Amino acid sequence: MTFRGDTAVVVLAAGAGTRMRSDIPKVLHTLAGRSMLSHSLHAMAKLAPQHLVVVLGHCHERISPLVDELAESLGRTINVTLQDRPLGTGDAVRCGLSALPADYSGIVVVTAGDTPLLDAETLADLIETHSATSSAVTVLTTTLSDPHGYGRILRTQDNAVMAIVEQTDATPSQREIREVNAGVYAFEITALQSALSRLSSDNAQQELYLPDVIAILRRDGQTVSARHIDDSALVAGVNDRVQLAQLGAELNRRIVAAHQMAGVTVIDPATTWIDVDVAIGRDTVIQPGTQLLGHTQIGDRCEIGPDTTLTDVTVGDNASVVRTHGSSSSIGAAAAVGPFTFLRPGTVLGTGGKLGAFVETKNSTIGAGTKVPHLTYVGDADIGDDSNIGAGSVFVNYDGMTKNRATIGSHVRSGAGTRFVAPVNVGDGAYTGAGTVIRDDVPPGALAVSGGPQRNIEDWVQQKRPGTPSAEAARKASAEQSTPPPDADQTP
């Protein structure tokens, strides 16, 4: 989506956000996997404007490096400018204009960094309206059932935009108006610069209000237009954590619906949370209580959930992931994971593999067709194809100072309760006996067993634990075993 080259966007993100009651700058609070500022800049970047400027103030030293990272990921330049003192939105825009070339003469779009649902399509409509009407300014408006806190749109009898009055400066009758300023504008730069130079701080907040530019341009005889949108959530701002949660839920509803329309079955949208950068293939079923976060990628025809959280996890086609918590891992096609499986970063499960109940994996590669069915820890290991790791096995990877790797070949069968003390190698086709502690390499095809013959110490419980329920049970059992059974053929 592109427009004529002479379009610049200024994003206002200098506010302190005191109502958030947070040590985190307001625009860095997240929803659907992105900060509010990131949502805004992603939308602005889709317009491909000639210039993109972010105005920072409060906590600029924390926000500016993140803007630079985002600019790199978006593959475009984003200029940052600083508002030294909080003198109002009018002053913030003036700071933003200072980052533009002196000879810039095109359209300036002004928006805020705390409207995370604002999309590129809405901005495109605003710019098209602005260009079609040859206006000095076009303001985006919407109608709210409860407009408290928003600037009201004042219109003339012929319905032209006359001015914008802030909540704190509005009369009782003006506060009854439900059409509000969405805080998004398209300006001709020369008209904007002229009006900014005449702003006054003679108001309740003693600040330079950007909306006052509307009345100034109107008095100058300039054309002032408005673009009304019915979907007010697109321009809803965030000032506190209640609004953050409300917009987060609304954004999630839209994300889930988009996946449903693309061929994904979501059994219970109310308990399903999907980040904006998640991709899900067709005919996949998402069960209740599932969170798909970060850059998680799900293939076609998968079954995910219930009660599953995946963060930056790749899942191949036809895989099943049930009651699993996983991050920074890869699950192969037709693999089965869960229930109650913990995938820590660096886990790679091959095609058709299985990680079952109460299995934890970390920094390990598990080959195609290999099964780790239950009650096992696999850390810092490389396991070949079509092997089976018995229940209760542990990869002992830490020696108190360093993590060591274990390598298990293909077609290996390990008995229940095997301990692989790394570093160690087990060759292809080898077997291990139940309870074996593997401290040395096992050759291909060998059976590894450890420990001496079992030794039973008779009557130990009665001697060492006399009077206990165990001792009494043992006494009775011994007595029963020592009593000969009656002779069935004996006659009285």
UniProtKB/Swiss-Prot annotation:
Binding positions for Mg(2+)?
Answer: 114, 239
Disordered: annotated span: 451-492
Tell me the segments the record calls region N-acetyltransferase.
Answer: 263-492
Q: Compositional bias (Pro residues) spans?
A: 483-492
Tree of life domain: Bacteria
- Stretches for region Linker: 242-262
Q: What class of enzyme is it?
A: transferase
Give its E.C. classification number: 2.7.7.23, 2.3.1.157
What reaction gets catalysed by this protein? alpha-D-glucosamine 1-phosphate + acetyl-CoA = N-acetyl-alpha-D-glucosamine 1-phosphate + CoA + H(+); N-acetyl-alpha-D-glucosamine 1-phosphate + UTP + H(+) = UDP-N-acetyl-alpha-D-glucosamine + diphosphate
Which InterPro entries does the record cross-reference, listed alphabetically? Answer: Bifunctional_GlmU (IPR005882), GlmU-like (IPR050065), GlmU_C_LbH (IPR038009), Hexapep (IPR001451), MobA-like_NTP_Trfase (IPR025877), Nucleotide-diphossugar_trans (IPR029044), Trimer_LpxA-like_sf (IPR011004)
- For this entry, list what GO says about its biological process: cell morphogenesis; cell wall organization; lipid A biosynthetic process; peptidoglycan biosynthetic process; regulation of cell shape; UDP-N-acetylglucosamine biosynthetic process
Which intervals of the chain are annotated as region Pyrophosphorylase? 1-241
Similarity remark:
In the N-terminal section; belongs to the N-acetylglucosamine-1-phosphate uridyltransferase family.
HAMAP family, per the entry: GlmU
Name the record gives this protein: Bifunctional protein GlmU
According to its UniProt entry, this protein's organism is Mycobacterium marinum (strain ATCC BAA-535 / M)
The encoding gene: glmU
